[in-house]
């Protein structure tokens, strides 16, 4: 019955998106100011200082969540700037639930059970009114605060719920969590994470998930039998990052890369269905489809709501897609003629590995980066693969950057939405953050500039009284491997959320509709429909 509910609710969500598009097709353009330095912080006696610097999460209703502080710090921006503060004064802000911007957590008093924060980390906003955030509690040793993550869920009008806490009993075990690492989260608010428990070294690691409103449960644990093999799970986490190989799709599928051991240690990718069934999708040593070779290593997987996977091998020599209908299918491989281009897909370029960190949208569209080789010249590029596997280049190093008189110099990680629109950050002229920008495709696949360093951005939503500020630096959450919580600033409507710092030292969070179908203000007309969808999700336990 749960599967029927999930299918029906997914269909209803699609109808909601279609209704918004049908009513508002063609209404594009404009930038909405969500929060800005000096703006009153709702529900407090403070004003915003630094806003959104650690990334902005955007849902499919155009709502955002981010970290902000009432204070300012002077520091130099490099590539991914984040202030180091003398005091802990960060807070979590969200627009989830359609109630406007509000603060839901802050460093200091305010956690369930009268606990206090030592620090908070960037939040994720779901499509159904949930904001999920994490951080460490006061009293946890500073040396362990990185691993002593506590995951909490906020819903408008409800008391915050602790999803998992350092020191609590880990489900399906009799031991407590020693460490909880940054979670992977989907658009429905489902959560999956790596954790360590107080147990022997061969039973230390595990993966837990909370799916479809059900209780948190164990997905896999070190030392248990590894399905699809004759061995046991050996390693379930990644050295240092711990979470770059774990993903959860909007259908509740959990995909992860790990290692198993029989007579030797081998890597594999496993997929857990929403019902908890776990299967090995590909193992080192398996024949690699479309080649005469076997997998020597497998890269971290990406998963969508249909349980489809996209992944490369660890050396970035090829890219595959998996679905229950087709099995494993080769998308692209090193040495292959790049379609429509006078070059071949090449081996890894310095700092730009071919087929790195693919993105996979809800509609089955994939996005990936590739190095291209023509003669002795290597260039970077961004590609789109449609659900049938057809490839099309979106951008290339040295090609004109739309909206500028310059060319692309290098690219950030790309992301793709359910329509197949791609968005990415890139630099022009040189590698300076002063020549950084965001580009995205419109509904016709035409690449358009969203915002660039040096632009004059009107931060006042009232066009009658413009307030133009020059962008010095900006950032965009692409949901790549170093943000494997899958926080993204690009939604299925084509809206782009971003952080900008201006030459006057102020900063803000903004949502652009340059390539979107509807204006977010027009979504209000469909508010009752959206609320009914959210209400139905709650009643069915989602």
Q: Can you say where each PLM-predicted feature lies in the sequence?
A:
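A short, hydrophobic C-terminal helix/tail in secreted or cell-surface proteins
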Residues: 518-536
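Bacterial N-terminal signal peptides
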Residues: 9-22
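Sec-dependent N-terminal signal peptides
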Residues: 7-12, 526-529
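Short, charged juxtamembrane terminal tails flanking transmembrane helices
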Residues: 538-542
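Conserved "turn/edge" positions that cap or connect secondary-structure elements
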Residues: 24-516
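Bacterial N-terminal signal peptides that target proteins for export
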Residues: 1-9, 520, 537
């Amino acid at each position: 019955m749960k599967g029927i509910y999930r299918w029906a609710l997914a269909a209803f969500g699609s109808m909601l998106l279609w209704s918004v598009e049908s009513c508002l097709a063609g209404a594009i353009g404009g930038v909405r100011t969500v929060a800005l330095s000096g703006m009153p912080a709702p529900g407090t006696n403070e004003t915003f200082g630094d806003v959104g610097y650690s990334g902005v999460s955007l849902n499919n209703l155009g709502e955002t969540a981010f970290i902000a502080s009432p204070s300012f710090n002077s520091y130099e921006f490099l590539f991914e700037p984040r202030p180091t503060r003398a005091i802990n004064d960060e807070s979590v802000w969200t627009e989830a639930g359609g109630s406007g911007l509000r603060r839901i957590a802050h460093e200091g008093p305010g956690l369930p059970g009268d606990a206090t924060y030592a620090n908070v980390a960037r939040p994720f906003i779901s499509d159904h009114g949930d904001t999920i955030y994490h951080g460490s509690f006061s009293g946890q040793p500073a040396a362990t605060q990185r691993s002593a993550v506590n995951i909490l869920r906020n819903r408008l009008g409800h008391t915050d719920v602790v999803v998992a806490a350092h020191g609590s009993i880990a489900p399906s075990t009799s031991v407590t969590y020693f460490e909880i690492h940054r979670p992977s989260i989907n658009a429905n608010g489902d959560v999956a994470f790596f954790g360590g428990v107080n147990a022997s070294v061969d039973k230390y690691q595990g993966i837990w998930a909370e799916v479809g409103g059900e209780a948190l449960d164990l997905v896999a644990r070190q030392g248990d039998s590894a399905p699809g093999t004759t061995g046991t799970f050996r390693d379930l986490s990644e050295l240092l990052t711990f979470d770059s190989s774990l993903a959860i799709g909007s259908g509740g599928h959990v995909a992860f890369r790990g290692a198993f051991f029989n007579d030797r240690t081998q890597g594999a990718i496993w997929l857990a269905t929403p019902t908890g069934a776990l299967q090995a999708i590909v193992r080192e040593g398996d024949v690699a489809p479309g080649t005469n070779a076997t997998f020597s290593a497998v890269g971290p997987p990406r998963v969508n709501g249909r349980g489809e996977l996209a992944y490369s091998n660890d050396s970035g020599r090829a890219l595959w897609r998996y679905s229950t209908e087709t099995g494993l299918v080769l998308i692209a491989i090193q040495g292959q003629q790049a379609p429509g281009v006078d070059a071949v897909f090449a081996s890894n370029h310095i700092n730009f590995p071919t087929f790195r960190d693919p993105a996979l949208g809800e509609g089955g569209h994939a996005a990936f980066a590739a190095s291209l080789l023509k003669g002795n010249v290597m260039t970077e590029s961004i590609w789109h693969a449609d659900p049938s596997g057809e490839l099309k280049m979106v951008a290339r190093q040295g090609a004109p950057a739309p909206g500028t008189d310059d060319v692309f110099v290098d690219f950030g990680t790309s992301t793709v939405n359910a329509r197949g629109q791609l968005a990415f950050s890139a630099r022009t002229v040189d590698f300076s953050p002063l020549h950084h920008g965001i580009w995205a495709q419109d509904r016709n696949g035409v690449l358009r500039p969203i915002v660039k360093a040096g632009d004059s951005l009107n931060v006042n939503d009232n066009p009658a009284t413009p307030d133009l500020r020059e962008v010095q630096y900006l950032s965009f959450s692409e949901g790549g491997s170093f943000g494997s919580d899958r926080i993204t600033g690009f939604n299925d409507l084509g809206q782009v959320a971003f952080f900008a710092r201006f030459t006057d030292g102020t900063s803000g969070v903004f949502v652009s509709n340059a390539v979107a179908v509807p204006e977010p203000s027009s979504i209000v007309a469909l508010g009752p429909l959206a609320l009914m969808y959210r209400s139905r999700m709650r009643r069915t336990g989602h």
